[in-house]
A protein has these predicted regions:
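Gly/Ser/Thr-rich loops at beta-strand to alpha-helix junctions
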Residues: 118-122
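Long amphipathic N-terminal alpha/beta scaffold segment
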Residues: 82-84, 88
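A short, well-structured juxtamembrane/interface segment
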Residues: 56-72
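Flexible, charged surface loops at secondary-structure boundaries
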Residues: 69-73, 105-111
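Rhodanese-like catalytic fold shared by cysteine-dependent sulfurtransferases
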Residues: 2-60, 88-109, 124-182
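Short hydrophobic beta-strand that contains or immediately precedes a catalytic carboxylate
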Residues: 67, 75-82
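Hydrophobic anchor at the start of a short beta-strand
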Residues: 76, 113, 137-138
Length: 182
């Protein structure tokens, strides 16, 4: 009798482990990013950004939707604050590297300037430093992740791309149809 009970408990424990692992890996083997639809990913990305924003509360934000409108009107300059490897995977339209902007911020007097990174934490810190120097610059709310989730396009050296550098597993929330890289 004790053996049957132990066998029963072992089988039950195995089933529970299987269920837990299935949940952990995102519905039985599917990557977590595929479990969520884009509206859920938006909520996650904007919630993460709101948490990060607490570290630079004085920084002015610009929403991806507002930035898209300014892009259509050719009135925005994007400053990519990510590392070169990330920028080689994809960038926002006509973005310049942080170093390029810092070397001559006066070069863009007629543009709204918006910095970004994966989720706009690093860019938020960058914007904070630039604001202390008297430079008017915004932080793209939610970064490149929110940008593609709101319908913005990204580019590599060959043109439009569906690859997006998400920095790491924690930020693996690309829009549907995008291939995450980290």
């Amino acid at each position: 009798m004790a053996i049957r009970k132990r066998t029963y408990l072992s089988v039950l424990a195995g089933i529970l482990c299987f269920i837990a692992l299935g949940w952990w890996y995102g519905q039985f083997g599917r990557p977590v990013r595929d479990v969520y639809d884009d509206s859920a990913k938006k909520r996650i990305v904007y919630r993460m950004y709101a948490d990060y924003k607490k570290e630079f509360p004085g920084v002015a934000d610009i929403s991806p939707k507002r930035a898209l409108k300014l892009l259509r009107d050719n009135q925005i300059l994007f400053v990519d604050t990510r590392e070169p490897l990330e920028m080689r995977i994809s960038m926002l339209p006509d973005a310049v590297a942080r170093e390029t902007f810092v070397s001559n911020p006066e070069k863009y007097p007629d543009k709204t300037v918006a910095a970004y990174c994966t989720i706009s934490y690093r860019s938020g810190k960058f914007v904070e430093k630039m604001m202390k120097k008297g430079i008017r610059i915004y932080n793209l709310e939610g970064g490149i992740l929110a940008w593609v989730l709101e319908g913005g396009k990204i580019y590599d050296a060959d043109g439009e791309t569906r690859r997006i550098h998400v920095y790491g597993k924690r930020w693996n929330y690309p829009a549907t149809g995008y291939e995450p890289v980290w």
